[in-house]
Amino acid sequence: LISLFVSKRLPALLHSEVPATAIAAAILAFCGTAFALPFGKTYPEVAIETGHIEGQATEGVEAYLGLPYAAPPIGPLRWRAPQPPAPLKGLKQAFQFGPACPQIPSKDVKLDEMSEDCLTLNVWAPERRPGKRAPVMVWFHGGAFENGASRMPIYDGHNIATHGVVMVTLNYRLGHLGFFGHPQLTEEAAAEGVPTANYGLLDQIAALQWVQRNIQAFGGDPSNVTIFGESAGGIGVLA
């Protein structure tokens, strides 16, 4: 069922292991659909580096969806390395997934669900315990670097979070917007002293940096992060 499934610990970070049951649950959950039932919701608030966000808690798991981890890669930021996100205005309700990055429409991702302003991630966190930090798992979706999105139901992280893990999924630029190479872009990047090409992989790195800076707010341990992915997502892990 899984063409290339790779799990990797971030180097020199971890002191405790992600529970084996959580790894198994992650694999099984991403081979089938996992949905949280909308009963008994509460609305927790969390302060992150860009402002305050409000999530939804169901069955002991808090969900925060569509969180920008980088500025919209449009206009002068198209075909550029990801830049920091702007501060939030007021309390942001993180109830909806962000749009998918542009790609050929499919049964999984419709055209009206896409936007170039797509660099968002989602966090599912178990109930926080004072003095305790939960291990973190970050998922890179597959799709040949041409399609896929974190909003797809198969990537819902609720069930994994019930195993005591903070679960993160994310979008990254795809196709010609994520992996376009051209001599002019190379020259411009060299003149500016910034990275060029493989923008989708740079997005993944930016998301991991966001996790390092912010995951404690959700009860996660930034020194205990596992990245994993399937197909193109597995290649991203290896990269």
Positions of predicted regions on the chain:
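N-terminal secretory signal peptides that target proteins for export/translocation
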Residues: 1-16
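Non-catalytic accessory segments of hydrolases
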Residues: 36-199
